[in-house]
Design a protein with these regions (language model features):
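Short loop/helix-cap segments at secondary-structure boundaries that form the rim of catalytic
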Residues: 42-48, 108
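Flexible, polar/low-complexity N-terminal or interdomain linker segments that lie immediately upstream
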Residues: 1-33, 37-44, 117-139
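Short Asp/Glu-rich motifs
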Residues: 61, 110-111, 127-128
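Catalytic cysteine-centered active loop of the rhodanese-like fold, especially the PTP/DSP P-loop
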Residues: 63-109
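Short hydrophobic/charged patches on amphipathic alpha-helices used for structural packing
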Residues: 22, 62-63
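Glycine-rich, highly charged phosphate/nucleotide-binding loops
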Residues: 53-61
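Conserved beta-strand positions in the Rossmann-like core of class I SAM-dependent methyltransferases
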Residues: 32, 51, 99
Length: 139
């Protein structure tokens, strides 16, 4: 086994991306998506159906609120935010199977995946810079 094979295989065991998380949700795979950002970020918008648990609260809340047999996917703001990694560490310490969603909320939104806030669903946006935007052809 090469160093590269070992490295990338290990990396993929611990991370996922917005497209794969959305596909897992649509397929009904049993995952819990956890937003580890703060209250203001959560109020602004989040992944539809996500649970809010800021990373600093995971140690005290997870056991009471989450089934430890269900895999967890954590996310924060963007590729430049490390709160997702901090949250993943906290879940791992507690024995949860956890993966970090790379790209965070930013890439979820840019890929046009469903989001919501306390008012309800938010408009879906599609950014052609990060994904293929397919237009429906009439006929």
């Amino acid at each position: 086994m090469t160093d590269a094979l070992e490295y990338f295989s290990a990396k993929l065991r611990h991370e996922t991306d917005a497209s794969d998380v959305y596909a897992a949700q649509k397929a009904g795979e049993g995952i819990i998506v956890v937003d580890v950002r703060g209250d203001e970020a959560w109020a602004q918008g989040r992944i539809t159906g996500a649970l809010h648990m800021p990373y600093r609260e995971i140690a005290e809340r997870a056991a009471a609120e989450l089934d430890p047999t269900v895999p967890v996917v954590v996310y924060c703001w963007s590729p430049g935010c490390n709160a997702g990694a901090k949250g993943a560490v906290e879940f791992a310490k507690l024995g949860y199977s956890v993966r970090e969603m790379i790209g965070g909320y930013e890439y979820w939104v840019r890929e046009g995946q469903p989001t919501e806030n306390d008012e309800g669903p938010l408009p879906r946006l599609f950014d052609a810079q990060v994904m293929v935007v397919r237009q429906t052809v009439a006929g």
